[in-house]
Amino acid sequence: MLKGGIRAAFAACAVAFAFVMNADARELPRPETFTLRNGLQVVVITDRRAPVVTHMVWYRVGAADEPRGVSGIAHFFEHLMFKGTRQIAPGEFSRTVARNGGDDNAFTSWDYTAYYERIARDRLELVMQMEADRMRNLRFSDETFASERDVIAEERRQRIDNSPGAVLGERMRAMLWPHHPYGTPIIGWLHEINALDRETALEFYRTWYAPNNAILVVAGDVDAAELRPLVERHYGRLRPTRDLPERNWVQDPPSVGPMRVSHRDVKVRQPSMSRMYRAISYATDEGRQAHALDVAIDVLGGSETSRLYRALVEEQRIAVSAGASANTGGRGGGSVSVYATPVEGVSLERLEAAIDEVIAEFLGDGPTEAELARAKSSMSAAAIYSRDSQESLANIYGASLAQGESIDDVVNWPRDIEAVTREEALEMARQTLVLDSSVTGWLLPEDGQ
């Protein structure tokens, strides 16, 4: 399962962080944490409501860490990690979890790769033993590797190549980040997937899949005192990677002008347009810049009360949908997306011009105090009514730490959102919504509009 942006299931940091925030909440629950001698960071989120636990291992490696020419190798391990060790037969990992009443899965972003199990508390040690085993002892044959490579190539054909919107989005990202690895698709380019080999995969695994490059997050019916002996027993003996590589990614120079791309496909029935801007993220900002950007973009296009929706859908009636979103969770930066679909008979030229007018007006006067308050409230409410569960907190803390943030950053997020001023939101909107730092994409039927 590919994750972009988590925040990812979230991957938008703002939406994920806002979980459990309400009118009185000013911070998120603070977990217990400790670090083993081999470098494994452990985060424990106690929740005694049910005898259930969520066990997650987050590796600080994702698609952005792949060497040039081997795109898709990070995602490849979502498949390979289930192919067995000396102790566990191929496919037996998930079957064992299921036989014990649990479920498991994995996901990849540009910044991390994560594996999780949700299971009864009295089965925690079982999944911990299996997860620790495959951290360092994975085994797969040339035949297994080749078979999974074919599976992933077909996955790409179905999810990307057969989806006009996904193809356009992939092209837009490649233009927005021509050198930065965020411009490379998580699943990889097809010709590079087909060229992947077992030895390259093993070297990637031996380097990055190590306790000193991992975060163990356990949420549920357990506390640190109960958990630590189990962690020491199963993870404490694993050897760390010596000289773990620095995650130094190539940076893009400033854009010199707006970029455009269009994609035509016989499968497109309804034209649409979208635009992506480069942006800061929680890992790259200073002070409350990312918080302010999240609030600003929510005012601009985060809901049916937003500027874009009201102007284009309700007032001018030229769009069936319109909005904007901020992906501020990336370790290496973020992005803002603006998008709309016209009503029948309205051209994309007219729709784009109307979007530009709304944005220009927003950058001129900024959010009102009422809009600011509504945005903060909606960010809170959307999270409160979403997944009020231990998995949500495990995802929030795991993704945040893997992307370079701290526990304090997570705990204080609601308070920092509440503190965003109108002036801060406007300043970040003006810094970000710059055409020279954008790519505009049109999705069109094969025969045009």
Features from the language model and the residues they span:
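N-terminal secretory signal peptides that target proteins for export/translocation
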Residues: 1-5
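Non-catalytic, conformational "gating/processing" segments within enzyme and secreted inhibitor domains
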Residues: 149, 202-234, 437
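Active-site SXXK
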Residues: 71-85
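Bacterial N-terminal signal peptides
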Residues: 9-20
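M16/insulysin-pitrilysin zinc metalloprotease superfamily fold
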Residues: 84-87, 118-149, 228, 304, ...
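Short pre-active-site segment immediately N-terminal to the catalytic Zn-binding motif
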Residues: 62-70
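Non-catalytic beta-strand/loop surface segments
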Residues: 21-63, 89-123, 159-213, 237-283, ...
